[in-house]
Curated annotation (Swiss-Prot):
Keywords: DNA damage, DNA repair, DNA replication, Endonuclease, Exonuclease, Hydrolase, Magnesium, Metal-binding, Nuclease. Its EC number is 3.1.-.-. GO terms for molecular function: 5'-3' exonuclease activity; 5'-flap endonuclease activity; DNA binding; magnesium ion binding. PROSITE patterns: XPG_1. Mg(2+) 1 binds at residues 27, 80, 152, 154. Belongs to the XPG/RAD2 endonuclease family. FEN1 subfamily. The keyword RNA-binding does not apply. Structure-specific nuclease with 5'-flap endonuclease and 5'-3' exonuclease activities involved in DNA replication and repair. During DNA replication, cleaves the 5'-overhanging flap structure that is generated by displacement synthesis when DNA polymerase encounters the 5'-end of a downstream Okazaki fragment. Binds the unpaired 3'-DNA end and kinks the DNA to facilitate 5' cleavage specificity. Cleaves one nucleotide into the double-stranded DNA from the junction in flap DNA, leaving a nick for ligation. Also involved in the base excision repair (BER) pathway. Residues 116-248 are annotated as: I-domain. Pfam families: XPG_I, XPG_N. The gene is fen. This is Flap endonuclease 1. Its cofactor is Mg(2+).
Length: 328
């Protein structure tokens, strides 16, 4: 979910054409989750092949990524590794929410409430090993690079942007700012009706407007609540900023409120400010493997062959074996 920083950021509208020629790191879990949630049948169930395997994520990756490549926008997917131990409670809460949504989905389905059934079905979405494995296989066949993070995918994606190996992170979560991404892109959707909502958030601009350092932004996040701590009841982002402006640090702000942290703040600072990232990664766009793509998508997963060939042609037209130096 990330930190609720929507009210304190001032995003700039950006046109899709401004992303042409740029490498973008993509928070794979975030994006694949959206594909699984949104690409569903009328009864709320995900898209499946004739053998019952879920294919919503493959559909999204293949057709949306090929369209990005056609527009000369170069995505690099970054996959989550092992979550920090401090995230365990957040993960358990999400599991409970999904269980409750599953219950409400079945109830809505039983009474024939299609709208409610679809809404609650989307909330049951989860990523399993098979979905991640098939996503990586598809990207390999498409010639699209991906990086396996050690821990948080957002941290790795943000690090790659901070090193100027990519221009921006594509994610809905504001955690990228705490992780040090110099730029993040929100609402990257390919339909014309949604393209007007495309947003660019600059870390430098955000910190300047808020009169905060990145370290202080992390302190504000902890006051509000992160994936690693609950935060202080009643403290939103704006109030958190006022407290940090007044007291300078999280510890002094907590003391003024007569509050304490349930976890060591230094551990959370370490996650955001010095994340465990992969330094030796390769960004290389290759030509798609047409015959293997057709076998995988059309043969194994019953995709429409004509539509799949069209997507492959988009990839072939824009990609050739090339190293990172060639793209920049």
């Amino acid at each position: 979910m990330g930190v609720k920083f929507k009210d304190i950021t001032n995003p700039e509208p950006i046109e899709m054409k401004e992303l042409e020629g740029k490498i973008l790191t993509v928070d794979a879990s975030n994006v694949i989750y959206k594909f699984l949630s949104s690409m569903r049948q009328t009864d709320g169930t995900p898209l499946r092949d004739l053998n019952g395997h879920i294919t919503s994520h493959l559909n999204g990756i293949m057709f949306q990524t090929s369209t990005l490549i056609e527009k000369d926008i170069k995505p690099v997917y970054v996959f989550d590794g092992k979550a920090p131990d401090l995230k365990k409670e957040t993960q358990e809460e999400r599991i409970n929410i999904k269980k409750e949504s599953e219950k409400k989905y079945l109830e809505a389905k039983e009474v024939g409430d299609v709208v409610a059934a679809r809404k609650y079905a989307a909330r049951t979405t989860h990523l399993n090993k098979e979905i991640i494995k098939s996503s990586k296989k598809l990207l390999d066949l498409m010639g699209i690079p991906y990086v396996q993070a050690r821990t948080e995918g957002e941290a790795q994606a943000s690090y790659m942007v901070s090193q100027n190996d990519a221009w921006a992170v594509v994610s809905q979560d504001y955690d990228c700012l705490q992780f040090g991404a110099t730029r993040m892109i929100r609402n990257l959707k390919l339909s014309k009706s949604n393209s007007k909502n495309l947003e660019l958030i600059s870390l430098e601009k955000t910190l300047k407007e808020l009169n905060l350092t990145r370290e202080q932004l992390v302190d504000v996040a902890m006051l509000v609540g992160t994936d690693f701590n609950k935060g202080v009841y009643g403290i939103g982002a704006k109030k958190g900023i006022k407290l940090i402006h007044k007291y300078g640090t999280l510890e002094k702000a907590l003391e003024s409120l007569n509050e304490t942290m349930e976890v060591d703040a230094e551990l959370i600072r370490e996650i955001f400010l010095n994340p465990n990232v992969v330094h030796n990664y390769t960004i290389e766009f290759k030509r798609p493997k047409k015959s293997q793509l057709l076998d995988f998508l059309c043969g194994e997963h019953d995709f429409d062959e004509r539509r799949t060939i069209s997507a492959i042609k988009k990839l072939q037209a824009k990609t050739a074996q090339s190293s990172l130096e060639d793209w920049f």
